Amino acid sequence: MAAKEVVFGNDARVKMLAGVNILANAVKVTLGPKGRNVVLEKSFGAPLITKDGVSVAKEIELEDKFENMGAQMVKEVASKANDAAGDGTTTATVLAQAIVNEGLKAVAAGMNPMDLKRGIDKAVAAAVVELKALSQECADSKAIAQVGTISANSDESIGDIIATAMEKVGKEGVITVEEGQALENELDVVEGMQFDRGYLSPYFINKPETGAVELDNPFVLLVDKKISNIRELLPILEGLAKTGKPLLIVAEDVEGEALATLVVNNMRGIVKVAAVKAPGFGDRRKAMLQDIAILTGGTVIAEEIGLELEKATLEDLGTAKRVVITKDNTTIIDGNGAEEQIKARVGQIKQQIEETTSDYDREKLQERMAKLAGGVAVIKVGAATEVEMKEKKARVEDALHATRAAVEEGVVPGGGVALVRVASKIANVDVANEDQKHGVVIALRAMEAPLRQIATNAGEEASVVANTVKNGSGNFGYNAGNDSYGDMLEMGILDPTKVTRSALQFAASVAGLMITTEAMVAELPKADAPDMGGMGGGMGGMGMM
């Protein structure tokens, strides 16, 4: 085991604080509408230019091991805020820096670190309650667009496109962000349920101009096995021929004689039919077939539940308004399933999302839920260069997370105002002693830090702005974008409650641990091994003649 270096007391705290300040100072320049960019060197390709706090934090590694420990702990604050709410990473970093700096001053002055931490924790718990009381519901598209705009560093086009996407696919719908090909942002919306399986034979195509199969008011047959014998399908096909309606078959596979017969019947116009493979594999395929069954009001024909294809009737089939099948995708539009059953299925998938520990499973479950709940929207980010594309894509992703958080827990006045208003209401929180009281004061001072930093980044005197805002009431605050004061909600400057709450809780949690640190342990640098000795001279007796 390698030898360790141990530092104690004030020496440890000074080193740790230096690391905290280096990382926080690099991150906090990005805060607010007039925040600056940070350029990150990449081992290959062009440097990355960003205003995303967590991206900056993740890049920072310090040479001094004790300073690096301080930096890594603040990095943890940014990462946790990002994981919980998807935004607010810079705010969380600014709050953590303020609490650590004030807290370590108090420890150096002889106060009890544990009581300071208890005071900070009490203040934060009271602040969270007040934040929830201050919160307002974020229901309409205008408010969603405003939240997106603020999170995307005052880029209105991003806020608007996210609001439009949410309007199209609903609050539960899946919205993904991709790199586009154009200069402007674009929005693609896939309505209905789409899955990545295309037609099994090009002979099913009935729209040669688009290379697609389009079925109007079709029946939908769902089978959880391979179909290779046409006799299994005959009862269904005979019943279908009488109705004159088209049929979509979704099965594990349709092959051999069964596929050939379907193709021939389709080409002759006896029955209008198309077949696709079921999406997914294994248990996920069974679940997705059940999703389609609920969406279309049909039944999955599966032998494990005692249903046989030969005995299936038209009552077992689902129906939809329209189905479009391309080479790669199948889209079922306006399935005729019962609304209550669809809602119940969505609720069931929601429960699974909460319980799963796998990110991959969570993503797939969210996709399934979105396909049932409304659809999928794809925001294609446009930019002139690759460097701009990466920076803009990161902002769109942040804004998307912020709007989701706003829909979930509501919004509070932005620009750091919410924390200032909350601080004024919790000044008299109950404490056991003077040191705990000072812990509360530390938390209250820290809650002003985001507002002060926004003002500093805008080139204003932080103390003047902070005092002006504190002397106001309600939603009155400072708009750094146009250097004016007024009602933050009316000016459209909103922060998601969840983002503000998460930033405060994670900052206080990690900062409290740092204040109570008394020793730090790190590996000593390994001594370099000596270089190999040089080779000996040439062979003897080889002199020149």
Curated annotation (Swiss-Prot):
Subcellular location field: Cytoplasm
Cross-referenced Pfam families: Cpn60_TCP1
Catalytic reactions on record: ATP + H2O + a folded polypeptide = ADP + phosphate + an unfolded polypeptide
Presence of the UniProt keyword Nucleotide-binding in the record: yes
CDD domains linked to this entry: GroEL
Coiled-coil parts of chain: none
UniProt entry tagged with the keyword Cytoplasm: yes
Entry-linked InterPro entries: Chaperonin_Cpn60_CS (IPR018370), Cpn60/GroEL (IPR001844), Cpn60/GroEL/TCP-1 (IPR002423), GroEL-like_apical_dom_sf (IPR027409), GROEL-like_equatorial_sf (IPR027413), TCP-1-like_intermed_sf (IPR027410)
GO molecular function terms attached to this record: ATP binding; ATP-dependent protein folding chaperone; isomerase activity; unfolded protein binding
A Gene Ontology cellular-component term: cytoplasm
Annotated EC: 5.6.1.7
PROSITE patterns: CHAPERONINS_CPN60
Binding site for ATP: T30, L31, G32, P33, K51, D87, G88, T89, T90, T91, G415, D495
NCBIfam families (alphabetical): GroEL, PRK00013.1, PRK12849.1, PRK12850.1, PRK12851.1
PANTHER family cross-referenced by the UniProt entry: 60 KDA HEAT SHOCK PROTEIN, MITOCHONDRIAL
Family that this chain belongs to: Belongs to the chaperonin (HSP60) family.
Name this protein carries in UniProt: Chaperonin GroEL
Source organism of the structure: Shewanella amazonensis (strain ATCC BAA-1098 / SB2B)
Lineage per the UniProt record: Bacteria, Pseudomonadati, Pseudomonadota, Gammaproteobacteria, Alteromonadales
Gene: groEL
